[in-house]
From Swiss-Prot:
GO terms for molecular function: RNA nuclease activity. This is Pollen allergen Phl p 5b. Has ribonuclease activity. May be involved in host-pathogen interactions. It holds the Pfam family Pollen_allerg_2. Belongs to the Poa p IX/Phl p VI allergen family. Homodimer; disulfide-linked. InterPro entries: Poa_pIX/Phl_pVI, Pollen_allergen/Os. Residues 1-19 form the signal peptide. It comes from Phleum pratense.
């Protein structure tokens, strides 16, 4: 059976609650989306297609009256997500959840502010999906060129960190919003320590991992628990990806810590400026 298209908010669509408000001047249209060039899995390719559709939907909504913004955005964006639903059913619940979180989080004193808030929230929710697919799609490091330069133990720990992240993210996904941090932290610590045994503290990249976790936690300033966790997961995803890249070129552990922490800060900082980012799509 064909996969269901992700829900678009309560019956009648989000436009219903906004169209009753006074009109407002259209925002500046977003720049036309361009496909990014480094997708490596089918899901990543679909995410990039959705990114192009997302940018196009924002641009289309920017050029219509207030009463038509949500309807226009929804029509344009649904066509992109429908293609993803048909080709990768596993993306459906993720897109559905992203849209639901964005719809519930939309606030603003004016119709324009409400719509911008919705797009900003959806931007960050989609960023988490894209970031998770990126880190989960990193090739086993042993398949990358130049891996002979890195000690086998250091190569293995990268895979173990990535595996622990997946386990923890999966556990947190089913936990109540208020418990996501606790569940993630407990599952991540348990998985990484079990997989490395007594050698946990001997790996050079452990300091960078700890720095990344601290940066990611420190960056979660959003009020809503589900948004806090989404920002944290995106930040840690980027940090682990950065650590993997640093290890691949065999840089010192101090360099890995700097890159990983910087990636976490950058990812979280994107949330505070989400309204600006939204105009250009959610791809990093």
């Amino acid at each position: 059976a064909a996969a269901a298209v992700p829900r678009r908010g309560p019956r009648g669509g989000p436009g219903r609650s906004y169209t009753a408000d006074a009109g407002y001047a259209p925002a500046t249209p977003a720049a036309a989306g361009a496909a990014a060039g480094k997708a490596t899995t089918e899901e990543q390719k679909l995410i990039e297609d959705i990114n192009v559709g997302f940018k196009a939907a924002v641009a289309a909504a920017a050029s219509v009256p207030a009463a038509d913004k949500f309807k226009t955005f929804e029509a344009a964006f649904t066509s992109s997500s429908k293609a993803a639903a048909a080709k990768a059913p596993g993306l459906v619940p993720k897109l559905d959840a992203a849209y639901s979180v964005a719809y519930k989080a939309a606030v603003g004193a004016t119709p324009e502010a409400k719509f911008d808030s919705f797009v900003a929230s959806l931007t960050e929710a989609l960023r988490v999906i894209a970031g998770a697919l990126e880190v989960h799609a990193v090739k086993p490091v042993t398949e990358e060129p130049g891996m002979a330069k890195i000690p086998a133990g250091e190569l293995q720990i990268i895979d173990k960190i990535d595996a622990a992240f997946k386990v923890a993210a999966t556990a947190a996904a089913t936990a109540p919003a208020d418990d996501k941090f606790t569940v993630f932290e407990a599952a991540f610590n348990k998985a990484i320590k079990e997989s490395t045994g007594g050698a946990y503290d001997t790996y050079k990249c452990i300091p960078s991992l700890e720095a990344a976790v601290k940066q990611a936690y420190a960056a979660t300033v959003a009020a809503a628990p589900q948004v806090k966790y989404a920002v944290f997961e995106a930040a840690l995803t980027k940090a682990i990806t950065a650590m993997s890249e640093v290890q691949k070129v065999s840089q010192p552990a101090t360099g890995a810590a700097t890159v990983a922490a910087g990636a976490a800060t950058t990812a979280a900082g994107a949330a505070s400026g989400a309204a600006t980012v939204a105009a250009g799509g959610y791809k990093v």
